[in-house]
């Protein structure tokens, strides 16, 4: 649904408040009695109370601060990856700091979230709130920034003639092989 069928929205358990699904470019016949649509250029709505207008304006500012009106674009020449932090869903288990990869198989239509572009499928796949193990690489991604934010970081480059030592913050607790002199 593109929010054009109010009865279908409500019949499918639609709830009040910001929606996980976003609208991409196009023309939509949306009932503005039921919905407010916030874009970079304007807010589409029927007249709102002063309080509701302030809430919508604050939300538009918040989305704008997260660059939420534009897709995430990562070019090969940027030498960057996108670190995703999800702001919805169940919390990580105690002691964990990075959420595992879920819903990454296009073969499973029910849970394939296509790199966080379908928030409902991400959550259906068991996705957790917090920083994600799965990163974004070259491509264009239409992600609801109320659902998830993306921090761009430089790719790691190990110069010729040098090495990089890797320390993992995920996985099972391993045996410390560094020796007593390291401590």
Language model features with spans:
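Interfacial loop/beta elements and low-complexity acidic/Ser/Thr-rich segments
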Residues: 1-183
């Amino acid at each position: 649904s593109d929010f054009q069928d109010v009865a279908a929205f409500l019949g499918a358990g639609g709830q009040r408040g910001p929606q996980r699904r976003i609208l991409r470019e196009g023309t939509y016949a949306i009932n503005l009695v039921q919905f407010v649509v916030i874009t970079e250029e304007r807010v589409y709505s029927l007249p709102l109370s002063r309080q509701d207008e302030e809430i919508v304006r604050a939300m538009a500012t918040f989305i704008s601060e997260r660059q939420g009106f534009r897709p995430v674009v990562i070019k090969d020449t940027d030498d960057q990856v996108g670190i995703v932090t999800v702001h919805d869903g169940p919390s990580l288990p105690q002691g964990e700091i990075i959420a595992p990869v879920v819903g990454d198989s296009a073969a499973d239509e029910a849970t394939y979230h296509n790199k966080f572009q379908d928030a409902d499928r991400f959550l259906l796949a068991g996705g957790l709130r917090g920083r994600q193990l799965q990163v974004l690489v070259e491509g264009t991604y239409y992600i609801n920034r109320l659902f998830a934010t993306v921090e761009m970081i430089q790719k790691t480059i190990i110069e010729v003639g040098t090495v990089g030592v890797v320390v993992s913050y995920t996985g099972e607790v391993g045996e410390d092989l560094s020796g007593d002199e390291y401590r």
